[in-house]
Amino acid sequence: KANAFLSDMVDRPIRWMVDDAAKFTAREVRRGRRYDGIFLDPPKFGRGPNGEVWRLEEHLPAMIADCRALLDDKSKFLVLTAYAIRMSALAIGELLNQAMADLGGTVEVGEMAVREEARGLLLPTAIFARWSRS
């Protein structure tokens, strides 16, 4: 929500979700919902209350497919960030390229970093892949 404030978007219709992302996206697909854009920040690993296990490398393709089903020809973006994983930005970008091929647009990938104050070194923090409408 701080990002919405910093981006001067507090008055925009942003729907904030704090839920199991895989269950939420599957539910929204069943309901036939569509979104203008999606920010996706899944964990590397998670365990549900009933012993369910989430592993990013294993479950991300299905989650991206569900997210694709929530977008249509009016949708603007899908942004995915991932931390401390065995997949590269290139691999995640290819997953997005395949999932979003029918919508056109472009996929960009890269690393996120913070600059160390003392020596000015860039310290990697995560990778990202972003699909956007051309």
Regions found by a protein language model. Give the residues of each.
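S-adenosyl-L-methionine
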Residues: 1-39
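Alpha-helical scaffolding segments of alpha/beta enzyme cores, especially the outer helices
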Residues: 2, 23, 62-69
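Mobile active-site "lid"/loop adjacent to the S-adenosyl-L-methionine
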Residues: 18-19, 35-66
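Catalytic metal-binding/acid-base residues of hydrolase active sites
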Residues: 22, 43, 84
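Short, well-ordered secondary-structure micro-motifs
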Residues: 27-29, 49-51, 90-91
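Short glycine-dipeptide loop
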Residues: 66, 71-78
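C-terminal catalytic and target-recognition region of SAM-dependent MTase-like enzymes
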Residues: 75-134
